[in-house]
Amino acid sequence: LVAVCVSLLGAANIPPQPLNLKQFKNMIQCAGTRTWTSYIGYGCYCGYGGSGTPVDELDRCCYTHDHCYNKAANIPGCNPLIKTYSYTCTKPNITCNDTSDSCARFICDCDRTAAICFASAPYNINNIMISASTSCQ
């Protein structure tokens, strides 16, 4: 029993592997001035899922990012929601560093492009938490 407790204590000191979405959140904050939470529920595509026509330029950024992740998922063994990658942030510049892992590089490029797009697109407060049934046709 003591051996089990000691091994569990040792395992508790191992930091969790960051997931891709955490990296994407950090990239968003590197490229722009808004926090990633500003984009949850924005338009028809920012946040989980999406449908219809994007309502503005920022929503198109989310639409494009969603489709980029769909393309990444077509790479054998590539899961864009959990695959991590290497990048450098020198605010506001982002550089993807993976060269040998095509999945990691593809996802990093998806996230980098979206983060830069978010930073440059106008933010319309009226497009937060809109009704999908009426606005996302």
From Swiss-Prot:
Keywords noted in UniProt: Calcium, Disulfide bond, Hydrolase, Metal-binding, Secreted, Signal, Toxin
Cofactor mode of binding and number, as noted: Binds 1 Ca(2+) ion per subunit.
Superkingdom of origin organism: Eukaryota
UniProt keyword Hydrolase, yes or no: yes
GO annotation, biological process: arachidonate secretion; lipid catabolic process; phospholipid metabolic process
Top EC class for this record: hydrolase
InterPro entries tied to this protein: PLipase_A2, PLipase_A2_Asp_AS, PLipase_A2_dom, PLipase_A2_dom_sf, PLipase_A2_His_AS
Cleavable signal peptide: 1-11
Protein name: Basic phospholipase A2 2
